[in-house]
Amino acid sequence: MALPTVAIVGRPNVGKSALFNRIAGERISIVEDVEGVTRDRIYTKAEWLNRQFSIIDTGGIDDVDAPFMEQIKHQADIAMTEADVIVFVVSAKEGITDADEYVAKILYRTHKPVILAVNKVDNPEMRSAIYDFYALGLGDPYPVSSAHGIGTGDVLDAIVDNLPTEAQEESSDIIKFSLIGRPNVGKSSLINAILGEDRVIASPVAGTTRDAIDTTFTDEEGQEFTMIDTAGMRKSGKVYENTEKYSVMRAMRAIDRSDIVLMVLNAEEGIREYDKRIAGFAHEAGKGIVVVVNKWDAIKKDNRTVAQWEADIRDNFQYIPYAPIVFVSAVTKQRLHKLPDVIKQVSQSQNTRIPSAVLNDVVMDAVAINPTPTDKGKRLKIFYATQVSVKPPTFVIFVNEEELMHFSYLRFLENQIRQAFVFEGTPIRLIARKRK
């Protein structure tokens, strides 16, 4: 289920990124072991009082060449479009500026809650400066020192108080997927082609957190799908719609809301860093992944082309060896009919449950093939394994000492489990836990 979203806005040098880092905590500095997989600094998850939410630093999306006021308006537009709660950051040191008033006037138009955070209140003497900010007409100002971590708890309390109530779980029978890729890989053409394949359009469904439109349709076998909207802002976003950082943010939002991600590549352009970055985020988020190579009609081919592309994809996306690859053309409709079946197979893999007895047979056979490692004379002992969840399938392996379970041995066990069962298109998680 999609997390609610909080956007941080404000003019430059008021401390938006510092507040973002405080709210995000240690999550923001995480760099994954897998090459090409890192958390983007403009979008991450946070948690407070047992409520999780996504947080956007709109300042990280700015086009630095754009005029100053245009940058600020862009931030506010993103916040009003994307967010459930807006945190407007100002500076106690500079007081109210023309830019602050400009943003406040834009935010007046939104019906979403706005939390006014007065940053740089670094000592008690500065607290009196916050009262001037009542003039912005945005309610009570919250004194904050991002540099010292003072007042962020109050801002977080206000955020949680204003988050939308947790929605009921959506039907698990509907498969939610999104098409993700760089601008000009043909996502829009693919969407139109998929929806034009004699499908029954049930109804456009308003997005839960913004003015996005998701589309629900049913295939000839009666399976219901929801295609998650990734269209971006419908306002005068202009040039920003195609900027990479904004595109990354939209992709991450769509991935969060999806069960399965169709990673669209352009056969004419090959694989780029952006593609690897987004695929890594989807893998890290535990989503099903299908690699879709579009514009297959537009390139010259011989009997080696498919094999070369497959090898190139496996080499560049080494962390998703489980992802099926489909070569399509939105123009000629080539192989488009295969996509729903591939999506359904991935969904089935995501929801696979393995009986504990069968799983333990596979794990013990794996140990017989490749004995558990030792460290300083002590050997890892595996007692038993059990599956604890699906989407993605997650397995807990109970051992004598968690520290003895090296990641390379976990990877070996994962490979053995994959060989024994069909987990096409989905990551699986293995967690070592000490038996009590």
From Swiss-Prot:
Organism: Streptococcus mutans serotype c (strain ATCC 700610 / UA159)
Subunit structure and binding partners: Associates with the 50S ribosomal subunit.
Domain KH-like: 352-436
Annotated protein name in UniProt: GTPase Der
UniProt KW keywords: GTP-binding, Nucleotide-binding, Repeat, Ribosome biogenesis
Gene of this entry: der
Purpose: GTPase that plays an essential role in the late steps of ribosome biogenesis.
NCBIfam families the UniProt entry points to: GTPase_EngA, small_GTP
Gene3D superfamilies named among the record's database cross-references: 3.30.300.20, P-loop containing nucleotide triphosphate hydrolases
Annotated HAMAP family: GTPase_Der
